[in-house]
Amino acid sequence: MTTTTTKAIILVGGPSKGTRFRPLSLDVPKLLFPIAGKPMIYHHIEACSKVENMKEIILIGFFQESVLSKFISETSKQLNVAIRYINEEKVLGTAGGLYHFRDIILEGGPSEIFVLHSDICCAFPLNDLLQFHKQHGRSCTIMGTEIESAYANQYGCLVRDEKTAELLHYAEKPETFVSNLINCGVYCFSPQFFDVIGKTMIDLKTSGQNITTDYPEITRKGFDVERLRLEQDIFVPLAGTGFISVYPYVGFWRQIKNAGSSVYCQELYLNHFAKTKPEVLKKGNNIIGNVIIDSTASVDPSAIIGPDVYIGPNVKIGKGVRVIHSIILDQTEIKDHACIIYSIIGWQSLIGVWARIEGIPNYTPFLYSQDKRRGVTIFGAGAQANGEIIVSNCIVMPHKQLDRNYNNEIIL
C-alpha cells in the first residue's frame, strides 16, 4: 500500500515587508521575533511537524538564505522534520511564487500541500483541516473563522454555503459589510490546484485584465501577471465555481500586523499552552497567570511576574519589579521597583530604578484612534530609561537614553 505524504509551504515575505514591525525588525527579521518564547514561525513549523507523513516544510521568501540558515538547521533537528528555504529572486506575489516553484513543491508527489502565511497566530489545526479537505473533495480549502462584524472589513471576507462548505464569494477588505467569516491565511491544496493557478495565469496573460469565460472577471487596473496574488487574483475569480471549500475554524486567531501585536498574540499562545503543554509555563509564589521565563534569566524572588509575560535569556529582574503583559528580551536589565505593563523591552536594554514603562491595552485591529496611536510601548535594542521616569504609549528607537517623562511619542 502506497503511503501518502504531505508538504507545507510557509510564505515568509522579506525585509521590506517588516517595516511595520520596526524598531524590533531592525535587529531581527520579523518572522524570527520571539512570541511566547519561540520565533514567530516556529509555531507554524511545530504544527506542520505534527501532521502525519509530513515530508517537507518549505519557506518561500526574499530574505538572504544566511538570515534563516541557523534557525532552519536548529529547528529541523529539534522537531525532526525536513525544512528548506527558497529565495525568490524577485517578488512574485503569493500565488506567483507558489506557481513558480511548483516543481519543487510537487516533487515526490505529495497528496496535499498546506500553505500558511507567516504573520498569523492561531492553534493551526492542520490535521482537522486536512481531514475536512479530503472529505469535501475540492482542490483548495481555506480556513476561515468568525470575528466581530465591526472588524471584518480589515480582512478577506468569505461567503460560504452552509450545506456544502463551498466558497461562494470572496472579498478582500471590502468597503461595506460582506461577512464576519474571514480568511485565516491557512490553506490546504490538492496538487491539481496548481493547474488551476496556471490556467488562471494563462488567461490573465492572454486578456491583460480579464479572465476568460471559464472564470469570473478580474478588474484589477494595471495587472502584473508576474506578481499574482493568491487571495485577490485566484480566490476572487474562483469563488462560486466549485474549486474551493471553507473550513470553519473555532479557536483563537490574530494577525501579527505590527510589533505591538506580539504582546496580544503571546497572550493567546500562553493561554493555549496552559491547556496543551503546561510544562513550559513557570510556576512560583511570585508568578501570576501564564508566564515563560528562560532558564538563564535571573528574577528576584520579590518581583511579581505576570500574567502573560515572557522573560528571555540572561535577563536580570531586580527587587520589587512588576511585569505585566510584556515581552522582555535577551540581556535586558530591569532595576529595582520598576514597573513594566503592556510593553516590549528590546535586547540589552536598561530600565532604571522606580521607572514605569507602560502601553495602552488595545485588542482591536486599529492601532490609531482619533489620530493618536494607542498601543504597546516598544523599546528598541539597547535603549535606556533613567530611574523614576514614566514612558507611556511610546515607541523608542534603539540605543536612545531617556531622562524625562514621555507620553504618546515616537522617540527618535
Swiss-Prot record:
GO cellular component: cytoplasm
Superkingdom: Eukaryota
SUPFAM superfamilies: Nucleotide-diphospho-sugar transferases
Oligomeric and partner information: Component of the GMPPA-GMPPB mannose-1-phosphate guanylyltransferase complex composed of 4 gmppA subunits and 8 gmppB subunits; the complex is organized into three layers, a central layer made up of 2 gmppA dimers sandwiched between two layers each made up of 2 gmppB dimers.
One of the record's GO molecular function terms: mannose-1-phosphate guanylyltransferase (GTP) activity
Family: Belongs to the transferase hexapeptide repeat family.
Name of the protein in its database record: Mannose-1-phosphate guanylyltransferase regulatory subunit alpha
Binding site for GDP-alpha-D-mannose: E88, Q255
A Pfam family matched in the record: NTP_transferase
Function noted in UniProt: Regulatory subunit of the GMPPA-GMPPB mannose-1-phosphate guanylyltransferase complex; reduces the catalytic activity of GMPPB when part of the complex. Mediates allosteric feedback inhibition of GMPPB catalytic activity upon binding GDP-alpha-D-mannose. Together with GMPPB regulates GDP-alpha-D-mannose levels.
GO biological process, one term: GDP-mannose biosynthetic process
Domain notes: The N-terminal substrate-binding domain adopts a Rossman-like fold and has a binding pocket for GTP or GDP-alpha-D-mannose.
Organism: Dictyostelium discoideum
Region of interest (Substrate-binding domain), ranges: 6-259
